[in-house]
A protein has these predicted regions:
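Carbohydrate-associated surface elements
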Residues: 236
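A common structural junction motif
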Residues: 149-156, 249-257, 368-377
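Intrinsic disorder/low-complexity segments
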Residues: 4, 15-16, 23, 30
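Active-site SXXK
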Residues: 88-101
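Non-catalytic beta-strand/loop surface segments
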Residues: 5-9, 29-84, 99-141, 162, ...
Length: 456
């Protein structure tokens, strides 16, 4: 039930893999990877984009190599609308959509989907409620009809609300005993202390207990609307036919009274190192997260920071962090860095799981690597390896319909342009070591770190 931190800043990634944040486990190569043929990547000539009169944006790309189709998307209704007293309401509402509608109960909805091997699921992040589904192309009308039915006329039957509440509370109880989850949540509370991103989207036990069935009905009535909704459809269907099906299922939906989401306040950066520890008795492992706030996805520093992060703690055996903390010193079960970027401010952090007796030693090594990263940046060879890996893995991330759907949502969410993936290799290769160094120095300040530890 607990959610990884990148979900908070990158709501779309709940339904699809962000191809701009590629994992790095390729064999090192000092040569540039060959550029994929531009015609094989999504681009303006094969991405269909249209906005319906009611505000729904559809992006579609045909792929007739398999008989299936994927839908992914989001509605502008996330936890930013939650009050502190009922935090988790957006997620509770999203997870309750499939529990019954005005026309059918839960069993009837799932029986209809499972009878043709289709699936549909929902969840919520800070900014959006997200959905993901798949079916055979011939069953796309059924999939879209189900989507329309549950987002427009959910019933939230009381029996199902209480069952869902019990499941959510169980998930939160598990989270409270998970050292990695608690370290991640505590890190957010430090870095985003005076910002909405400090709050976990799935709430706390007391806030979930406070939510009533009528709260779900009210949240849906107020905040679910077609304006700002985005749907990506990829697979064995012509884009024009996909558009006609979306128009048929959702074209007459409207909610003109939906309010805009509250604007994100500016983030106040840390002025000193803040260390916070969460005690969880009976554990044999401690998890720590050390880091800072990071760039938003549209910031100019994002791509240099992403390439630098690959060197710091992703590429090969988890980069410099993995080599120093795990391979050479043997202090960690795992150690890596991550760059989480979305609509608002992101985070740049190093995570490690260690023996509780090794927390101080591992923390010192990580802080030493941060200081070295900020002082010297990356070498030309390290950057070249990272660039080759980014470029070489892009086609792999776009081999599946789900990967392409994620790419289309990425383009729309962050206004990257329909030709973004055709330009991607050139953008990556244009980054210089100095740009990586400047990005590192902008965000990492070794004397101003957030350090979160959870364990015995």
């Amino acid at each position: 039930m607990s959610k990884t931190k990148n979900v908070k800043r990158n709501d779309v990634s709940r339904t699809a893999y962000y191809v701009s944040r590629i994992t790095h486990h390729a064999v090192r190569s000092t040569q540039h990877a060959a550029s994929p043929s531009s015609s094989s990547l999504p681009g303006p000539d094969d991405i269909f984009r249209v906005q319906l009169p009611n505000g729904i944006t559809l992006l579609s790309r045909a792929n007739f190599n398999s008989p299936s189709v994927v839908i992914s998307g989001y509605i502008q209704a996330g936890s930013l609308f939650d009050t502190d007293e009922k935090l988790g309401l957006a997620d509770f509402t999203a997870l309750g959509l499939m529990r019954g509608s005005a026309q059918r109960d839960l069993q009837q909805i799932y029986d209809a989907l499972e009878s043709c091997g289709a699936s549909l699921s929902f969840g919520a992040g800070a900014h959006t409620t997200v959905f993901s589904g798949r079916s055979l192309a011939e069953d796309l009308p059924l999939l879209l009809d189900t989507l329309a039915e549950v987002v427009r006329q959910p019933a939230f039957p009381s029996e199902q609300v209480e069952k869902l509440r019990a499941q959510l509370l169980t998930g939160l109880a598990i989270r409270a005993q998970d050292t990695a989850d608690m370290a991640a949540m505590t890190f957010d509370q430090i870095v985003f202390a005076n910002h909405p991103y400090r709050r976990p989207d799935d709430g706390y036990p007391e806030t979930i207990q406070a939510i009533r069935g009528e709260d779900l009905v009210d949240f849906h009535r107020r905040f679910y609307a077609p304006r700002g909704m985005v749907i990506a459809i990829v697979g064995a269907v012509e884009p024009q036919a996909a558009m006609e099906q979306v128009q048929r299922a959702l074209g007459d939906w409207d909610n003109p009274d939906k309010p805009d989401a509250p604007p994100l306040p500016p983030l106040t950066p840390l002025q000193e190192t803040v260390t916070r520890r969460v005690e969880i008795a009976g554990k044999f492992q401690a998890d720590l997260v050390i880091g800072v706030s990071g760039p938003a996805r549209r910031d100019l520093e994002y791509l240099p920071a992403s390439l630098g992060n690959s060197v710091l703690g992703q590429f090969g055996m988890m980069g410099r962090i993995g080599e120093v903390v795990r391979e050479k010193s043997g202090l960690a079960y795992y150690a890596y860095s991550s760059l989480n970027a979305g609509v608002g401010p992101g985070s740049w952090e190093i995570s490690a799981g260690v023996n509780p007796d090794n927390v101080a030693k591992a923390s010192d090594l990580i802080r030493g690597e941060i200081a070295r990263f900020v002082e010297k940046g990356v070498t030309t060879e390290e950057l070249s390896d990272s660039q080759a890996n980014f470029v070489g893995r892009l086609p792999l991330s776009l081999e599946s319909n789900a990967g392409v759907a994620g790419a289309l949502l990425n383009i729309e969410r962050f206004e990257l342009g329909l030709d973004y993936y055709r330009r991607f290799a050139d953008l990556v290769r244009a980054v210089t070591p100095d740009e990586v160094l400047q990005a590192a120095r902008k965000f990492f300040h070794p004397e101003r770190l957030a350090i979160a530890i959870a364990g015995p």
